[in-house]
Amino acid sequence: MDHKSPLVSWNVFGFDIVFNLASVLMVVITAILVFILAIVCTRNLKKRPTGKQNFIEWVFDFVRGIIESNMAWKKGGNFHFLAVTLILFIFVANMLGLPFAIVTHDHTLWWKSPTADATVTLTLSTTMILLTHYYGIKMRGTKAYAAGYFKPFWPLAIINVFEEFTSTLTLGLRLYGNIFAGELLLGLLASLFFEQPAWGWIISIPGLIVWQAFSIFVGTIQAYIFVMLSMVYMSHKVADGH
């Protein structure tokens, strides 16, 4: 079944800027959930961690491993909290659309994974790429940073600049494509259950169970890949050899 998106358009200086209210809502919900998770896991910290403290410390150690695989910790440590926040946000965002969807009587879809919207994922990727430029200039200086685009020889400058755009697109669209495809198939299986009650459940229920499990795996891997590539791009900008 086709679903509509709750769109609102604002005219700014003659340009129509369109917002998907469902995506905005889900981004806010994701941010709130990550904030609550961080508060809960960091309350009453102990020298001998247990339970939730063990979990959050494992996340920090795991992300530190990602960073250290790409750059020295002396520089990479500056991005530790950024990377932890990013992986938690994307993981939670990827999971939100899996248990259920909320669709109103007019077939407007309100509850979904925000990362199933290309606008959200491209915004995330653009933000990360811009941050790599910011920290590259901040940590290396404008002259050294700009000179990196002309290495190993100056004709590569055009290719290096073009690579920034392709990196942004691939980083965002990879995440979007995987999450959108997963939720699309879940929707098809769910519609089969409701629209073909005589035999649809025979296919849809086992299919939903298997695909839910696979989608959790894919959502987790995609959060890891996004953060890993973000740190790869960051290391290229802040490393002295760039």
Curated annotation (Swiss-Prot):
Question: What is its membrane topology?
Answer: Multi-pass membrane protein
| Pfam family, any one | ATP-synt_A
Q: Could you give a single Gene Ontology term from the biological process aspect?
A: proton motive force-driven plasma membrane ATP synthesis
- Which coarse location class describes where this protein primarily resides? membrane
The answer, when asked if Transmembrane is one of the entry's keywords, is yes
What does the record give under GO molecular function?
proton-transporting ATP synthase activity, rotational mechanism
The answer to whether keyword Membrane applies is yes
Cellular location of this protein? Cell membrane
Cystine connections: none
Q: Sorted alphabetically, which keywords does the UniProt record give?
A: ATP synthesis, Cell membrane, CF(0), Hydrogen ion transport, Ion transport, Membrane, Transmembrane, Transmembrane helix, Transport
Q: According to its record, what are the GO cellular component terms?
A: plasma membrane; proton-transporting ATP synthase complex
Membrane-crossing residues? 21-41, 83-103, 118-137, 175-195, 198-218
> Per its database record, what is this protein's job?
Key component of the proton channel; it plays a direct role in the translocation of protons across the membrane.
Listed under subunit, the entry gives:
F-type ATPases have 2 components, CF(1) - the catalytic core - and CF(0) - the membrane proton channel. CF(1) has five subunits: alpha(3), beta(3), gamma(1), delta(1), epsilon(1). CF(0) has three main subunits: a(1), b(2) and c(9-12). The alpha and beta chains form an alternating ring which encloses part of the gamma chain. CF(1) is attached to CF(0) by a central stalk formed by the gamma and epsilon chains, while a peripheral stalk is formed by the delta and b chains.
Query: What does the similarity note say?
Result: Belongs to the ATPase A chain family.
State what protein this is by name.
ATP synthase subunit a
